């Protein structure tokens, strides 16, 4: 049974969140009555309002109004006044992933999972299915530049979603095709152990029906190990690995662009197909790997090589994924969501490969628990930056953990051998340091999942103000 349109008003607690806003927008576009609340004003909240969705700021019981269904995410505490009011009114309380699964049930669905790279890969799959005229529904964990939003309500049979593993609810998603980009020791506050993370991803793949398939990156040892344990589902492997079914090779870089080839080898038919001189308007081998996952799916769905090439070349990227925010005196400034050591390392490697000058990393640690679990990894992930500036920790509601703060991280990075790492406190410190020692052709890269994106967007304007007139060069 499909969820009836006359189910009543659906209320989203935390509707401005990147995961919730896309689901709310698609339900609204499909004709359902949608409203919600969030703690603060944001670009997502404003976008939803422009579409006609009523959004309250602040969480109060009266915000529910005449709601008949209440949707919440793991971030919503059970002490939330709206959650309590919904319980008292005996309204259905639905987890975010269950609502996403409801959208997927009556479509052919692709779920993109993995510890890192999900958002970019989801966007790339969407771009190639767009190019192939599939007109998909898309719900992503980041703003897709081509759409100006994190969702798309297409009329086609296919749906592409980002599968968030952070709270384990991605196992509820009914996917016909499952992608796993990588598996790392992340979200241990939920899983408790790395073995539990491994088990969850195995279940994610094994949930694929017999007529579907999994797309697994065998450049990552954990994913290659997972591929070896799947014996009752069709698996397509990808990566730079010479044994991959869909392999990328012959990379060449031109600033922020990458050229490469892809070799597709079918284990079913033995047939080989080469896609030559593909252009990806992004830097970084990790992004080429993400693109290769999308190519594997597009090829399997019968999209022509020409349309794959076109879709890839026209890919507009994702907000906060190595996004250029501006420049000043030839210094290029970028914003990236990377907050895990693996992500930080990949972004800085891409910056190093692209920059003609030095790389200056400005990192905002995200959550004390992540620092605690991955302290040694954080100490070793900044090697491709000439200078590292560490900001105060963005706590995301957590209490500090003694011995695992920003000052301790700075000392730990120094002890691991980095030659120039410093503690900073605010944007004023960044303006002062960058204006004094950065030079033309240097890259300044902001990293973090917290509010550091505001610094990244503000810095070009602040620096241009030092000249007494606006020399800001926007993207």
From Swiss-Prot:
One GO term describing the cellular component: cytoplasm
Organism ancestry: Bacteria, Pseudomonadati, Pseudomonadota, Alphaproteobacteria, Hyphomicrobiales
Main location: cytoplasm
Species of origin: Bartonella tribocorum (strain CIP 105476 / IBS 506)
Sequence similarity: Belongs to the MurCDEF family.
First-level EC class: ligase
UniProt keyword Amino-acid biosynthesis present: no
Residues that, per the record, bind ATP: 114-120
Catalytic activity: UDP-N-acetyl-alpha-D-muramate + L-alanine + ATP = UDP-N-acetyl-alpha-D-muramoyl-L-alanine + ADP + phosphate + H(+)
Subcellular localization, as worded in the UniProt entry: Cytoplasm
Keyword DNA damage attributed: no
Biological pathway: Cell wall biogenesis; peptidoglycan biosynthesis
Name used for this protein in its record: UDP-N-acetylmuramate--L-alanine ligase
């Amino acid at each position: 049974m499909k969820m009836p349109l006359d189910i009543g008003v659906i209320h989203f607690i935390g509707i401005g969140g990147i995961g919730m806003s896309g689901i709310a927008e698609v339900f609204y576009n499909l004709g359902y009555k949608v409203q919600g609340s969030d703690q603060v004003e944001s670009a997502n909240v404003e976008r939803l309002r422009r579409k006609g969705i009523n959004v309250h700021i602040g969480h109060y019981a009266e915000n529910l109004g005449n709601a008949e269904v209440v949707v919440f995410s793991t971030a919503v505490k059970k002490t939330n006044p709206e959650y309590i009011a919904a319980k008292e009114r005996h309204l259905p309380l639905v987890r975010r992933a269950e609502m996403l699964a409801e959208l997927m049930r009556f479509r052919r669905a692709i779920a993109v999972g993995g510890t890192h790279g999900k958002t970019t890969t989801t966007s790339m799959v969407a771009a190639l299915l767009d190019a192939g005229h599939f007109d998909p529904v898309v719900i992503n964990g980041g703003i897709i530049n081509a759409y100006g939003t994190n969702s798309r309500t297409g009329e086609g049979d296919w749906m592409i979603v980002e599968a968030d593993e952070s709270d384990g609810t991605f196992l509820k998603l009914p996917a016909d095709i499952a992608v796993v980009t990588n598996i790392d020791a992340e979200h241990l506050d939920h899983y408790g152990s790395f073995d539990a993370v491994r088990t969850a991803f195995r279940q994610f793949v094994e949930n694929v029906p017999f007529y579907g398939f999994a797309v697994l990156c065998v450049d990552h040892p954990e994913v290659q190990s997972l591929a070896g344990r799947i014996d009752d589902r069709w698996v397509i492997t990808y990566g730079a690995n010479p044994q991959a079914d869909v392999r990328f090779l012959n990379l060449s870089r031109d600033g922020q662009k990458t050229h490469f080839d892809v070799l597709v080898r079918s284990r079913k038919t033995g047939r080989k197909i080469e896609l030559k001189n593909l252009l990806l308007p992004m830097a970084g081998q990790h992004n080429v790997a993400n693109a290769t996952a999308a190519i594997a799916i597009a090829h399997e769905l019968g999209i022509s090589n020409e349309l794959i090439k076109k879709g890839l070349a026209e890919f507009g990227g994702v907000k906060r994924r190595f996004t250029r925010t501006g420049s000043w005196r030839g210094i290029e400034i970028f914003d990236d969501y990377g907050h895990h050591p693996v992500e930080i390392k990949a972004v800085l490697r891409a910056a190093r490969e692209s920059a003609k000058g030095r790389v200056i990393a400005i990192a905002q640690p995200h959550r004390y628990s992540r620092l605690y679990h991955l302290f040694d990894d954080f100490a070793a992930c900044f090697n491709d930056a000439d200078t590292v500036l560490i900001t105060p920790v963005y706590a995301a509601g957590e209490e500090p953990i003694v011995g695992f703060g920003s000052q301790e991280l700075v000392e730990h990075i120094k002890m691991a051998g980095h030659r120039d790492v410093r503690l900073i406190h605010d944007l004023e410190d960044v303006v002062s340091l960058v204006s004094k020692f950065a030079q033309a052709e240097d890259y300044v890269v902001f990293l973090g999942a917290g509010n550091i994106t505001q610094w990244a967007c503000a810095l070009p304007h602040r620096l241009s103000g030092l000249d007494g007139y606006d020399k800001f060069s926007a993207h």
